[in-house]
A protein has these predicted regions:
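Short, solvent-exposed loop/turn segments at secondary-structure boundaries
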Residues: 82-84, 201-206, 236-242, 303-306, ...
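Conserved SAM/AdoMet-binding glycine-rich loop
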Residues: 102-107, 116, 219-342, 353
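Radical SAM enzyme [4Fe-4S]-AdoMet core and its adjacent flexible, acidic
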Residues: 40, 236-257, 304-307, 367-398
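Short flexible coil/turn linkers enriched for glycine and charged/polar residues
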Residues: 173-176, 186-188, 285, 295, ...
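Proteins enriched for Cys/Gly/acidic motifs involved in redox and nucleic-acid/cofactor modification
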Residues: 1-235, 274, 289, 311-322, ...
Length: 467
């Protein structure tokens, strides 16, 4: 089997057929699509492919669903809260479908790869006409055409041939900040995580394709490019070419231009000294490492099936601190894993204090159907977990304030990303992914600016443009 395969010309034919159907229905007016994406950046990248295919089918895009001809929710299965939001928002479309029967409402993404979810959609949401999972993206036009053709519901999930498809048209959401997938799937099977079940096994894209896409993005003016994968440190496994993630990172970094290069997500068990050395020596690589540790207790890490311990994690963190000047460290933490005690939780707090992260993405454990952790005994009450969660936030807030305060008086290179609608202030990020707010012209958006840091407020910096 080749490393990758192009989506078929047949799908381009289906895009043309969709355009013909919509042209008849709309009597020459442009059809409108509304896409809402939940979850991770990998979902954002998938939605950009879907938008690319819809654009080739003649669609324009709306920010609200009210006047759309096609409505699609790209869903996330990582936490219960995201699933609840999807069900609530889909239910709210019932009246819209009643008023406009020709609207096609569709759901895709990770939730749709779960049998119990697909069954619930089929039984409880009869106005949803198209459902497909993460493994069906390469023939989305065919599925959509079939749903439009006779109005019959189309449901497809679990069609994983472990093949990786290339050649998608892509309509990116941003013009200066972009996502570049380098691999899909995960082989780690952490006991709490549903990703391997809904995204499949690891599949790496060919290096020359990734480098070519990165070069095109840089030449098109992209200033901040993030290489994406569920575990980027596993990149290259299974490819016919002998290549690893550090080698790929160095090759992309060698492309001329004024840009930052980021990546996510790294798994501590595969995070090597070679990768740290590559970041340290890089020209464009952001001095930011996101390395999820999830829990500071070895006992809990073993129950999570993380394949590293506290000592191994701290060894790679300390090596990174030693080698990379101005390193910004961020991480993910799960609070209240089944069987976790307050003594275990205190080990998490001590690790946070020892490392001094710039920021943390912290979540209370959310059981996922089909994972081993969902069947584990979980005696700690939700109220107790919430108490631990607040304690952790207090500790991290103090650390973040200290780290940000140390930057006051320094001048930082900042990518200006947006304008605050209420305050009129500009908002940007440093290479270390720290938010900076400042006064300035909207013309600065999408450009790098030198900013003197004048004030720190918890994890946000205030600054002023250096003329």
């Amino acid at each position: 089997m080749p490393d990758s395969q192009k989506i078929s010309e047949k799908q381009s034919e289906y895009m043309n057929l969709i355009a013909e159907i919509m042209d008849i229905r709309k009597r020459g007016e442009k059809p409108v699509a509304y896409i809402r994406t939940y979850g991770c950046q990998q979902n954002v990248a998938d939605s950009e492919k879907i938008k690319g295919m819809l654009e080739q089918s003649g669609f324009e895009f709306a920010d609200e669903p009210d006047n759309a001809d096609f409505i699609l929710f790209n869903t996330c299965a990582v936490r219960e809260h995201a699933e609840d939001r999807v069900f609530g928002n889909v239910g709210a479309l019932k009246n819209l479908k009643r008023k406009h029967p020709q609207i096609l409402i569709a759901l895709c993404g990770c939730m749709m790869e779960q049998e119990h979810v697909a069954n619930r959609i089929y039984k409880s949401f009869p106005f949803v006409g198209l459902v497909f999972g993460t493994h069906s993206l390469h023939h989305f036009p065919e599925l959509m055409y079939n749903a439009l053709l006779d109005g019959k519901r189309v449901f497809e999930r679990g069609n994983d041939d472990n093949q990786l498809y290339e050649g998608f048209p892509v309509k990116r959401d941003g013009t200066f900040k972009g996502w570049l997938p380098i691999m899909y799937g995960c082989n780690n099977f952490c006991t709490y995580c549903v990703v391997p079940y809904v995204r499949g096994r690891e599949r790496s894209r060919e290096k020359n394709i990734i480098v070519s896409e990165a070069k095109n993005m840089i030449e098109s003016g992209y200033k901040d490019i993030t290489l994406l994968g569920q575990n980027v440190n596993s990149y290259g496994k299974g490819l016919s070419e002998n290549v690893n993630f550090s080698q790929l990172l160095r090759e992309v970094d060698s492309i001329d231009g004024d840009y930052w290069l980021r990546f996510m997500t790294s798994h501590p068990k595969d995070c090597s000294k070679e990768l740290i050395d590559t970041i340290a020596a890089g020209t464009h690589i952001s001095k930011h490492l996101h390395l999820p540790f999830q829990c500071g207790s070895n006992r809990v890490l073993k129950a999570m099936n993380r394949h590293y311990d506290r000592k191994k994690y701290l060894e790679i963190i300390n090596y990174a601190k030693e080698k990379i000047d101005g390193l910004s460290l961020t991480s993910d933490i799960i609070v209240g894993f089944p069987g976790e005690t307050y003594e275990d939780f205190k080990e998490t707090l001590s690790l946070i204090r020892e490392v001094e992260f710039t920021s943390l993405f912290t979540f209370i454990f959310s059981p996922r159907v089909g994972t081993p952790a969902a069947k584990m005994d979980d005696p700690i009450p939700a109220e107790e977990k919430s108490k631990w969660f607040r304690e952790l936030l207090d500790v991290q807030e103090e650390i973040a304030a200290k780290r940000c305060s140390s930057m006051v008086g320094k001048t930082e290179k900042v990518l200006i990303e947006s304008e605050n609608d209420k305050s009129g202030e500009l908002c940007g990020r440093t290479s270390g992914n720290i938010i900076v707010e400042l006064e300035g012209s909207k013309d600065c958006i999408g450009t790098f600016q030198n900013v003197k840091i004048t004030k720190a407020r918890n994890w946000i910096l205030k600054g002023e443009l250096v003329k």
